[in-house]
Curated annotation (Swiss-Prot):
Keywords: Cytoplasm, Methyltransferase, rRNA processing, S-adenosyl-L-methionine, Transferase. S-adenosyl-L-methionine binds at residues 35-37, 55, 82, 103, 110. It is an enzyme of class 2 (transferase). One of its GO terms (cellular component) is cytoplasm. Signal peptide: none annotated. It is found in: Cytoplasm. The gene is rsmH. This is Ribosomal RNA small subunit methyltransferase H.
Length: 313
């Protein structure tokens, strides 16, 4: 199992060191995955320090428990979507923390296990669920969602300029018979895109597969909800590190940090600024941190990663 779950952690030191670790602090890894960030973070803590880590994937959780065995008693793994951050931490009596991190990339093992249906490069049933107990799958999206809804998700979540043509082709194909596998879907997408456009910009199915994955797991709304909760949970001086992999996630992070770090326009002449209008955050990374050339040589999947860090005031 461990060999199956090999995951190269992106921006490892930059993300964890950016939290300004307090040895006896309480920290949250919202995206446990391969446990690389969690393992390095735990190595920085004293025996009094605590880590809470979230994941929805049973295989990732089992692997992480093995990998983090030497820190037993210092960490708690919570099987939950991070959109329930506050609610889940409250069950452990935790209402404020010293640092929180998000790594929003899909774990490489999830991409590489053909049966998970995340990848257009392996034949597999259309699944794409991060949480295997969830009922909605990629098969449902592809075969039952109406044309208009498919156009919307391909355009909004995949930034796919041929959204209408692809949705139309899917609609035509599924009338004959259901689209059941990743390779069938990839072929339908390829046929819908004009030949000249197929020669540029990577695999023609990439954007649509991303869009379907985001829709199946409601990823963007979950992150919007979680980042607001994360900012609230931080103690003064506590920090948040966020790694994003595409412009949609990065935009959500940028807006959340910007809104929390600005003072709204108030009437002139107020003697003091009321607490609820004071900025909550100071942005640490004016520009996002990106992987070094050296890291990219070892891990090509890190290419689109961006790290943003902010501190609670």
């Amino acid at each position: 199992m461990t060999s199956l779950f090999h995951h190269v952690t992106v921006l490892l030191k930059e993300t964890v060191d950016g939290l300004n670790i307090k040895k006896d602090g309480t920290y949250v890894d919202c995206t446990l995955g391969g446990a690389g960030h969690s393992e390095y973070l735990l190595s920085q803590l004293s025996p009094e320090g605590r880590l809470f880590a979230f994941d929805q994937d049973d295989i990732a959780i089992r692997h992480a428990q093995q990998r983090l065995e030497r820190y037993r008693g210092q960490f708690t793994i919570i099987k939950s979507n991070f959109r329930y951050l506050k609610q889940q931490l409250a069950l452990y009596g935790v209402h404020e923390v010293d640092g929180i991190l998000f790594d929003l990339g899909v774990s490489s093992p999830q991409l590489d296990m053909p049966e998970r249906g995340f990848s257009y490069q392996h034949e597999a049933p259309l699944d794409m669920r991060m949480d295997r107990e969830q009922t909605l799958t990629a098969y449902d999206v592809v075969n039952t969602w109406p044309y208009e809804q498919l156009v919307k998700i391909f355009f909004q979540y995949g930034e796919e300029k041929f959204s209408k043509a692809i949705a139309r082709k899917i609609e035509q194909t599924r009338k004959q018979k259901p689209i059941e596998t990743t390779t069938e879907l990839a072929e339908v997408i390829k046929e819908a895109i004009p030949a000249p456009a197929r020669r540029t910009g990577g695999h023609p199915a990439k954007r649509v597969f991303q869009a379907i994955r985001i829709a199946v797991n409601d990823e963007l709304r979950a992150f919007e909800e979680a980042i607001e909760q994360a900012i609230d949970l931080l103690k003064p001086g506590g920090r948040i590190s966020v790694i994003t992999f595409h412009s949609l996630e990065d935009r959500i992070c940028k807006i959340a940090f910007k809104q929390a770090s600005e003072t709204p326009h108030l009437p002139p002449g107020l003697p003091i600024i009321p607490d609820e209008y004071k900025p909550k955050l100071k942005i640490i990374t004016k520009k996002p941190i990106v992987p070094s050339e050296e890291e990219l040589q070892h891990n090509h999947r890190a290419r689109s990663a961006k790290l943003r860090i902010a501190e609670k005031l």
